[in-house]
Structures are given as C-alpha cells and as structure tokens.
Amino acid sequence: MEGPDPARDPAEKIGQVRSNLRAWHPLDWLVFWIAVPALLFVVYALPQAFKDRYLVLDTQFPWRLQTWLLSSYTHSQFYPHLIGNVAFYLVVLGMIFAFEHDRRRFRVLAGWSFLAVPVLSSGLTIALWGAFGRNTTGQGFSAVIGAFLAYAMFLFVLWSVEDRMAVFDDPSLFPGSPARYHTLRILLGIALALIVVMGVISGTFTEEGGAVSNGIAHFGGFISGLALLLLMSLKKKGWSYFDTILGTSILVGILWYAYYLFILVRFVRSA
C-alpha cells in the first residue's frame, strides 16, 4: 500500500529558511556576525613581536599552551589570510543561520568549534611536524572555519531530506517504485560522502600566498565537527540509514587522509 509523499513543496522549504533566519536572537547576530570578526581584526592589530611570542603556535615551543588556543584567532597577514578567512566564515555562518533550527545543536557546535577545535588542530600540527622532523609556526582561523563548514554542509543535506528521513528506514512509507526508492538512498549516500570528500580536499597541503596551508588543522576541524554531529544525532534518536552512511563516510575519510599523511611523511623525511 502506498503512503502519502512525505516531501514538502519547495515553497515550504524556502519558508523554513525564512523562519530559521527570523528565529535567531539579536544577540546571536551581534556575537557571531560582529563580535567574532571584530576580535580577529583586533588581534591582527597587535604588535607582531607580541603575537610571535605569545599567540602564534611554534612547534619548537609546545609548552606555550596558550598558543594552542590563541593561534587560531591570530593572523599576521591582512590580505588574503585575514580577509579571506573572515569572508569565508561569514558565508558559512550564513548557511548555518539559514538551515539550522536546533539552538542546542548550534550552541554545542559553536562551543566545540571555538574552543576545542583550536586545541585539537594545534596538537595535530605539533604531532605531524614532529613526524616530519621539522619545525613550523601556525596561525589562522581556518580550522574553526573547517568545523563550521562541515556543520553547514551537514545542515544543507539534512534540510534537503529531513522531511523524508523516515522513508530511508521504512520503504513502505515511500510512494514511488522500489527503483526510485533505492535511487533516493544512493543519492543521499553520495551527498554525505561528498561532504567528507570536501574535508579531505581541505586537508591537503597547498601553497597559498607564499606559505603552505596547514592541511591537518583544516581536516581536524572539519572531521571532528562532522563526528560530533554524528554523535549528537545518535544520542538523540539512535542509528538510522542517514547516520550509518555518515559514520561510514567519516571512517573512510579518516583512513583515506591517514594514508595521505603516511605518504606525505615518507616523502618529507626522505627529501
């Protein structure tokens, strides 16, 4: 027996975005859209000698523990590093404000991104460059943005299929043919896998403006944010098809990136 099509029409989906945007408290707009970028500009304006000693992460001095957190809010180059990070942060934040309706999830992800991700990315940076047998310095908001980017992409996919979520676990709810049903499941799997692919791509080490991007910090922020979203989803409703595919994609992404790092370490140490 065919059930009703659980999907909402496009106008209703757009209406949800408008409702989400209107629901944010003015303080949310003030803190995340104004205060956070302002903080980055204020830190940039500090004397460079002060930043180098107290804020910038230096793998030669891992005991400067404050740099594990503060380096993520530090920039020494106005353009393109600072401006690029602020612009990308605002774009990603706009996606989050448009697609998020769960304030508790937002608070948890924001807290994780702003406080835990900088420490995690610094630890990964120190460990990797120790494996290289070399030293480096690190700074910038990119790891935090990576976590927010994973969050935004997750929300977009969730917004796209949330009204059909039960269908993925119960074929009897789907009004179409079995072929259409399995095609829909495959498309969801591809969408979730592409999120992780984006994380792996962001984790590659590339030259940007005369400096090498800190790929492991980007990947650490991205994949940890995605893993936290998975854990929150599991705690709320247990395993589903959506969570199974997301969890599998995260695991494959971590293994894929670990192999990339293994090859990279061998190359650097032999150079």
List each model region and its residues.
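A detector for small-residue-rich transmembrane helices and their helix-helix packing motifs
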Residues: E2-A271
